[in-house]
């Protein structure tokens, strides 16, 4: 055994790591490994099995249900071009959260079971279990290396010490498995970003430790492992979530204080030497030769350079992907970021305490901490500054302990715990840039690893050095902590079952957050409970009177309740909250796109009144003037212009919208409708096809293009038309229009039985579907089943009394097949009631008179019909036949029954044009 020339400074032992592995095999039995493995698995499953019964809620809606990047028809490359929510990274409204690997796993889930929540939650549970097991392995490695490097002897820790360290690692992973603050990351499906990133995060650390520790000497490096495994894991972690980049910082801490055994004071001394060469003479205690030699190690600088280089490279790449722009958030997302100095800095400091408190006491958890959840600290006199001060004192005390303790194992373990707590939290700390939230529980998933290790290490120290009573007390306290955490986690999962239960749990915790009340209102609104939703929206307005979104919600709910005057008033109030233009003063103000919805909603409400369409158009133009790239305003304005029959202008508006969003299927569809209105079917079909290319499930484009193809005719056109109609049915099997058009296709192919079934299905879904009712009746009549057609024709006339073709067909069946002239006459007279100049209805009424042998009345009727339609030859022919018969009857005696019947009910004035009827002049009184 060699002697150490510098007491308190322990030299690195080249044989430490190999001997450590030998010792591990002797002290770590397979039975214990299996038992710990099973305990962690059981803890995870017991805590989170009920999460698989939860639905897709909160952020899951945007990231999964509404994210087109998950759909199989979306090009896979889009996953790497868009942000986590499916918005192109180049767009201003993008959240700039680039997590393509996480989105790929969502896409895989969608491929297997679409939007069924169970699979998404099951994957999250398994990922959390994997993180816990990996964390146990990392803790074992870390604790043994810290203990070995801090030993006074070259040999590794004793067998009993290794066993205690393994217990510490097990406790850390078990506490991590059951901690309630992880519920949002595990039960919320979007938390998969944290889970995947953590797996790659831990794998990166293990690969780094392997690359610098395989040889047993810190002067050697396995560069292949470092570049290949570590680099890949670091990149993958960052592509799952941005926090993953911080593993490079943890590896720097590990390299300095564990691998090269530097002490924090060595680091201070080195920094001082950079600024003052005399430090060594003035501070001999700091000028430790061993520390200097370690700093001069070329291996250390090569590895640090590698870590810094790869980190900077990835950061530059990340900035490039973001388009060199930070995401833009509103002041409601993070109120402190919009506050003045010193309120902003004091609030940021208080948020650090709040995050620490959530780790220490996760009793009051909330899904949303934005808006007024945490009131801003009002200067230095705010009493909450005390908690901030105590937090920083506690952290400072731990830092001081690492610097001045002579127990090097303790020092290095504390350093790694602090590094694991602090570094992953830095991106969310507002230190470098303001973030879009106040507190986010899932952000604490990685930092909580360091916290759990710190608690476990404290427990291990009590077990090792405390008295028997302290050991029993610490064991009982740990058991209670694990049990209460597990129960809280299990109970917290129940809050995530539905959006309503989740947001109500938030309201119970925090009554100052207007967004929570808005979200409860949205949940009730989705269930059709508009009256209840209105109460929560109005409460949100009372809490945050300047929140435009809350006023919009109130207006929309009034609109759903058909209280249009109150809805308009709410929208006007929201509109009044926008920055007002001042004459002669120019200024720039950023308007959130979702706030501009007030113009859309107000215009849509006004447009219900046909006399106010121009006013609605003005609102759309006003919204466009505020944001020229506001595509939804262009789309809605185009609809208004179509109602105003200004199709050319509507076309220009839609084409302008394409300049800002040329991948919006709705715009291409609307352009297709414009060309359809202009009678340009071929151009319309081109735009419908483009809409389908961009969004293969676009229902209206599929339906309209199928109809155009059907009208085009031809076997290939009918085949494509049918495939598109069936595509619509895959997503909406209750669409009566699809069944009707499938029936029409079957008619074209003479598949009458199939057509009949499609028409009946359409009528079953919509009892007053006039086209389906008439075409089914016509089909039955044409296939020699006229009596079967009568019920459908009567149903048609009941819902649509003025349906002329239906009345004519029904009248014909009454005459030709049922011989019911009275009902036939009712049908034809009904036609003339709605359309007095309908030639066919009038002619058929004349035929009824002929069938009744009322020839005089029939002749007058046909003469009237001929005057209405002189070009119709068949009327003239029938008139000549009736007149010839009437001439023969007129030769009979007046008392003859045939002659009496011929002139029965005859009124010479019944069938006369208005100008042919005699007028009666009134005499003036003298």
Swiss-Prot record:
TM annotation in the entry: 37-57, 115-135, 170-190, 193-213, 223-239, 240-259, 304-324, 346-366, 385-405, 420-440, 443-463
Class in the EC hierarchy, top level: transferase
Recorded catalytic activity of this chain's protein: a di-trans,poly-cis-dolichyl beta-D-mannosyl phosphate + L-seryl-[protein] = 3-O-(alpha-D-mannosyl)-L-seryl-[protein] + a di-trans,poly-cis-dolichyl phosphate + H(+); a di-trans,poly-cis-dolichyl beta-D-mannosyl phosphate + L-threonyl-[protein] = 3-O-(alpha-D-mannosyl)-L-threonyl-[protein] + a di-trans,poly-cis-dolichyl phosphate + H(+)
UniProt cross-references to SMART domains, sorted A to Z: TPR
EC number: 2.4.1.109
Keyword Metal-binding applies: no
GO cellular component: endoplasmic reticulum; endoplasmic reticulum membrane
Involved pathway(s): Protein modification; protein glycosylation
Name of the protein this chain belongs to: Protein O-mannosyl-transferase Tmtc3
Organism: Drosophila melanogaster (Fruit fly)
Gene: Tmtc3
């Amino acid at each position: 055994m060699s002697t150490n020339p510098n007491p308190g400074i322990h030299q690195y032992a080249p044989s430490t790591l190999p001997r450590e592995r030998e010792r591990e095999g002797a002290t770590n039995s397979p039975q214990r490994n299996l038992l710990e493995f099973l305990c962690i698995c059981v803890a995870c499953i017991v805590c989170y099995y009920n999460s698989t019964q939860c639905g897709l809620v909160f952020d899951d809606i945007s990231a999964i249900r509404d994210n087109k990047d998950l759909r199989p028809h979306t090009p896979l490359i889009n996953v790497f071009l868009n942000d986590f929510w499916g918005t192109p990274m180049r767009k201003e409204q993008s959240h700039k959260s680039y997590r393509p690997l996480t989105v790929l796993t969502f896409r895989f889930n969608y491929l297997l079971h679409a939007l069924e929540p169970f699979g998404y939650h099951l994957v999250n549970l398994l990922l959390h279990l994997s993180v816990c097991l990996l964390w146990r392995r990392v803790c074992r490695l870390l604790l043994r290396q810290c203990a070995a490097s801090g030993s006074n002897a070259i040999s590794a820790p004793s067998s009993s010490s290794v066993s205690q360290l393994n217990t510490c690692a097990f406790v850390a992973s078990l506490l991590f498995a059951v901690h309630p603050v992880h519920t949002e990351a595990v039960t919320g499906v979007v938390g998969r970003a944290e889970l995947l990133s953590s797996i790659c995060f831990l794998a990166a650390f293990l690969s780094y430790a392997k690359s610098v520790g395989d040889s047993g000497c810190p002067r050697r490096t396995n560069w292949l492992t470092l570049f290949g495994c570590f680099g890949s894991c670091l990149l993958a972690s960052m592509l799952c979530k941005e926090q993953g980049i911080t593993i490079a910082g943890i590896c720097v801490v590990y390299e300095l204080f564990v691998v090269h055994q530097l002490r924090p004071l060595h680091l201070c001394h080195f920094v001082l030497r950079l600024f003052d060469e005399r430090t060594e003479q003035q501070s001999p205690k700091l000028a430790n030769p061993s520390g200097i030699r370690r700093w001069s190690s070329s291996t250390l600088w090569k590895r640090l350079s590698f870590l810094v280089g790869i980190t900077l490279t990835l950061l530059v790449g990340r900035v490039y992907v973001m388009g060199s722009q930070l995401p833009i958030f509103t002041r409601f997302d993070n109120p402190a970021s919009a506050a003045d100095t010193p309120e902003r800095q004091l609030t940021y400091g208080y948020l650090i305490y709040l995050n620490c408190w959530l780790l220490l006491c996760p009793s009051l958890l909330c899904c949303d901490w934005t808006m007024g959840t945490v009131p801003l600290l009002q200067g230095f006199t705010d009493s909450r500054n005390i908690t901030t001060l105590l937090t920083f004192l506690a952290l400072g005390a731990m830092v001081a302990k690492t610097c001045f303790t002579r127990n090097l194992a303790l020092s290095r373990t504390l350093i790694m715990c602090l590094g694991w707590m602090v570094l992953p939290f830095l991106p969310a700390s507002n230190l470098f840039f303001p973030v879009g939230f106040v507190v986010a529980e899932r952000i604490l998933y990685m930092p909580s690893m360091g916290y759990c290790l710190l608690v476990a290490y404290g427990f291990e120290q009590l077990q090792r050095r405390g008295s028997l009573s302290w050991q029993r007390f610490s064991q009982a306290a740990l058991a209670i902590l694990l049990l209460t955490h597990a129960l809280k986690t299990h109970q917290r999962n129940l809050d995530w079952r539905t959006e309503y239960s989740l947001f109500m749990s938030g309201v119970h915790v925090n009554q100052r957050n207007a967004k929570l009340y808005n979200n409860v209102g949205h949940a009730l609104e989705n269930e059709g409970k508009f009256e209840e939703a209105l109460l929560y929206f109005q409460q949100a307005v009372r809490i945050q009177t300047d929140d435009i979104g809350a006023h919009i919600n109130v207006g929309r709910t009034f609109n759903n309740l058909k209280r249009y005057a109150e809805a308009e008033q709410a929208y006007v109030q929201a509109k009044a909250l926008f920055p007002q233009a001042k004459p002669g003063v120019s200024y720039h103000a950023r308007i959130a796109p979702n706030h501009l919805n007030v113009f859309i909603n107000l215009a849509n409400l006004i447009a219900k009144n046909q006399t106010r369409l121009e006013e609605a158009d003005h609102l759309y133009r006003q919204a466009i003037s505020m944001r020229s790239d506001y595509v939804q305003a262009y789309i809605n304005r185009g609809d208004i212009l179509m109602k105003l029959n200004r199709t050319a202008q509507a076309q220009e508006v839609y084409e302008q919208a394409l300049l800002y969003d040329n991948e919006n299927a709705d715009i291409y569809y609307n352009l297709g409708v414009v060309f359809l209105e202009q009678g340009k079917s071929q151009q319309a079909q081109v735009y419908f096809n483009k809409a389908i290319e961009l969004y293969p499930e676009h229902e209206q484009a599929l339906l309209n293009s199928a109809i155009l193809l059907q009208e085009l005719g031809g076997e290939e056109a009918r085949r494509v038309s049918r495939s598109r109609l069936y595509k619509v049915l895959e997503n909406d099997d209750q669409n009566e229009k699809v069944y009707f058009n499938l029936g029409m296709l079957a008619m074209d192919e003479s598949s009458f039985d199939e057509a009949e079934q499609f028409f009946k299905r359409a009528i079953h879904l919509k009892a007053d579907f006039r086209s389906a009712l008439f075409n089914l009746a016509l089909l039955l009549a044409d296939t020699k089943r006229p009596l079967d057609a009568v019920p459908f024709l009567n149903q048609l006339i009941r819902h649509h009394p003025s349906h002329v073709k239906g009345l004519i067909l029904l009248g014909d069946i009454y005459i030709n097949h049922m011989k019911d002239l009275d009902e036939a006459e009712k049908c034809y007279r009904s036609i003339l009631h709605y359309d007095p100049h309908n030639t066919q209805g009038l002619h058929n009424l004349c035929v009824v008179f002929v069938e009744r042998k009322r020839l005089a009345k029939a002749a007058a009727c046909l003469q009237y019909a001929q005057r209405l339609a002189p070009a119709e030859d068949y009327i003239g022919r029938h008139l000549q036949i009736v007149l010839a018969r009437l001439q023969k009857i007129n030769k009979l005696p007046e008392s003859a029954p045939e002659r009496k019947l011929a002139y029965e009910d005859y009124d010479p004035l019944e069938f006369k044009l208005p100008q042919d009827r005699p007028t009666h002049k009134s005499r003036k009184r003298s």
